[in-house]
Design a protein with these regions (language model features):
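Active-site proximal loops enriched in glycine and acidic residues that flank catalytic Cys/His/Asp
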Residues: 15, 32-34, 158-160
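C-terminal accessory/tail domains of diverse enzymes
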Residues: 7, 41-183
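Beta-rich nucleic-acid/ligand-interaction surfaces
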Residues: 14-31, 79-85
């Protein structure tokens, strides 16, 4: 009340989008870490040979694939449903983006039963001779995938700004645990 009286501000308890204003959402950075601090989704220097990482990566992929509707529901409300697919938001369908390096490893495993190498990140030469080529990030930087691997975690980009991430995390934790139990 003091803020309104003193500054002539008003408070809207509604998330965007509004006409002419992009939507609001949040990015839920999700990973699996042991009680000793080991990140189970850390690819390491040789992700193609990191069996523990590949096991947990495949469990997450299977969980999201098998339970896409549940995951979608965990991020759903009327304002957010209006935002998704427009207003600088990811599409309203669940898909996973792994990045070029991990996609190549998964393709090798699917075709050959094993992976023997991984593509190294490319280097960008920006054309300035005093600046050396910069290592290009091999993960998703364009923000168009609702569920993207970003280095050592997944980023779930569908959750509404007005929602807690607890629902989405509960779905992720339970469905990944279910897949791991069945392996």
């Amino acid at each position: 009340q003091m803020c309104i009286r003193d500054s002539n501000f008003e408070c809207l308890l509604h998330e965007k989008p509004f006409a002419g204003v992009n939507g609001s959402g949040k990015h839920d950075n999700w990973s699996l870490v042991t009680n000793t601090g080991k990140n189970l989704l850390s690819p390491g220097k040789t992700p193609y040979d990191n069996k523990q990482f590949l096991l947990f990566l495949s469990a997450v992929i299977a969980a999201v694939d098998d339970n896409a509707a549940l995951l979608r529901m965990s991020a759903s409300n009327p304002g957010n449903d209006h935002r998704l697919g427009a207003n600088e938001a990811p599409p309203a369908i669940i898909s996973i983006f792994l990045g070029e390096q991990l996609e190549d490893i998964v393709e090798q495993i699917l075709q050959n039963g094993t992976a023997t190498h991984s593509n190294k990140g490319e280097r960008m030469d920006i054309g300035v001779h005093t600046i050396p080529p910069i290592k290009k990030d091999a993960t998703d930087r364009n923000r168009t995938s609702p569920f993207a691997f970003t280095g050592n975690k997944f980023e779930f980009r569908m959750v509404a700004s007005s929602m807690s991430i607890a629902g989405a995390n509960t779905v992720l934790n339970a469905t990944v645990a279910d897949v791991l139990q069945s392996m």
